[in-house]
């Protein structure tokens, strides 16, 4: 992989009766900005009645998971939530969404959940990809660009 890029893996074991493996590929710029280039999911959710709906649910969950992992912070001021709506609560926009591949494992087991698993695996996959790209482990969500900027600046200020 080129410098500043990395892949991260996350596994969801029997969440909502579904097994899911997710790989995220990200790029972290010298300024600490994160760009998600691609997400691949393998999903075993038991008997699949409508594969298109299963794929769409996983894709939507991944998009929501990226938004939450990168920007999903709710702050309080004087006991009230500051984020009133999407004008001040950042979510991934359509033109920012990476390609998302969903591979379905077909079997005859009982159907499991499909809405949540894509979301639940996204933050760990992104965190591991950021670590692979930078060597820096972030241990708090959201994976804030400010934290990455600080870490990237620290690295450039170090002498060899």
Annotate each language-model stretch with its function.
Residues 1-160:
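Cofactor-binding beta-sheet edge motifs in enzyme active sites
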